[in-house]
């Protein structure tokens, strides 16, 4: 449970960071 929550949180942050990077590039 704890690991799943941590991984999903990290994935969310990574996804948002990737979207932000793409927006700044475009």
Curated annotation (Swiss-Prot):
Record key words, sorted: Amidation, Amphibian defense peptide, Antibiotic, Antimicrobial, Secreted
Residue positions where Valine amide is found in the record: 26
Main localization category: secreted
InterPro entries registered for this protein in UniProt: Dermaseptin_dom
Domain of life: Eukaryota
Subcellular location: Secreted
One GO BP annotation of this record: defense response to bacterium
CC annotations in GO: extracellular region
Record has Repeat as a keyword: no
Known tissue expression: Expressed by the skin glands.
Job of this protein: Has antimicrobial activity.
Family: Belongs to the frog skin active peptide (FSAP) family. Dermaseptin subfamily.
Identification of the protein by name: Dermaseptin-J2
Biological classification of the source: Eukaryota, Metazoa, Chordata, Craniata, Vertebrata
